[in-house]
Amino acid sequence: MKKKIVAIVGKPNVGKSSLFNRIIKEKKSIVDNKPGVTRDRIYSNAEWLTREFILIDTGGISVDQQLFSNEIQIQTQIAIEQADVIIFVVDFLNRLDKDDKIIAKILHKSKKPVILAINKYDKKTIDEHNYEFMNLGFSDLYFISSTHGIGIGDLLDKVISYISKNDVELKDDSTKIAIIGKPNVGKSSLVNSLVNENRMIVSEIEGTTLDAVDISFSYNKKKYIVIDTAGIRKKSKLGQTVEKYSYLRSLSAIANSDIVLLMIDATKPITDQDTNIGGLIYDEKKPVIIVVNKWDLIKNKQEQILKKEEEIRAYFKYLSYAKIIFISALDKTRVTKILDLIDEIKQSLSVKVKTYVLNEVLNKAQLINPAPEFNGNRLKIYYASQVQAYIPTFVLFCNNPNYLHFSYKRFLENQIRFSFGFDSIPINLIFRERK
């Protein structure tokens, strides 16, 4: 089932980040009374009534130190283009101003469901200007307090009703591939090579692909769907907003894919933008292949290949399980090898480990390397089993998960990974206290 995107929109200082934190139940956004303080972490996985969705705090998109109405229009437009449902936050304690009305006007022009969240409501305040909020013209109004939790459950019930409306379980055995990376690394060229058609305009101008598209194709009697998230049109008015906009598109593609191809340019050094995109893959625990494109432009290939691999491993330590492949998308060199690697990864994902064999491996691991003392005691694992999930997931029952040091978790992960052939895919370990 596709993971939907819910965007929180509103002018600065109305409580978008507080609502974001309340919904995800963590403090991932910086919250301050100074307008425009939200930075960096603008998305998270969230869940309500067992339904998962991606939550975006559009306050994080505002990168300009000076907050103008046109900047608000830009972030609102981004939310409209990316989101399945929009939560429009206004301030109950202050009268509506021109920025609120600008946002409302833009949202009315969209075809997206909009829920008006009237924040900072405390049930004690006289509702003298409620009519103002009704005059914004939205049928779904909820009086909430993100600080005190008032009305949040009802708000989320409405969100879920919208994102569940068009759910259709399609039986499709196609492997969904997300192709992500910075603009101009050759994503569209790779799509063209994979599907053997010139379906997209490919040029040296950064950001010539306007929209993410899904393309179906077959290879060796196997079906694939490739999602190309190539660079967006670079409008001067967007400025630094472009990079974060592309992250949101990549996030959606990653969340709804089976396997991710992270493309980097062989002719350029790895940058923070590359590693930040890699971080999105790590957060979603998706299988990934790092595709080094434009290898045809490199001289002394044999000498350079080891250097490039070392550089990639150094920058993407958190993706240590990722396969690396060197290609030329334009020349179609080694392009079909990517599909062979994808098939290998899918085989690894389907491996089911017998419980008794898993416990033998873990018992041996604890004998070879006992857990270090942490938080006043040592971790003791009693037994473990694999549970149903897309990536191999194991529940380990122990004396107390608080005694687990991150380095020991990594050790156990590696023991399982190499014992059962999971060296090219992510795995998930869940530690639970034995009752």
From Swiss-Prot:
The name this protein goes by in its record: GTPase Der
Function: GTPase that plays an essential role in the late steps of ribosome biogenesis.
Subunit field text: Associates with the 50S ribosomal subunit.
Domain KH-like: 351-435
PANTHER family: GTPASE DER
Similarity section: Belongs to the TRAFAC class TrmE-Era-EngA-EngB-Septin-like GTPase superfamily. EngA (Der) GTPase family.
Protein residues bound to GTP 1: 10-17, 57-61, 119-122
Organism per entry: Mycoplasma capricolum subsp. capricolum (strain California kid / ATCC 27343 / NCTC 10154)
One biological process term in Gene Ontology: ribosome biogenesis
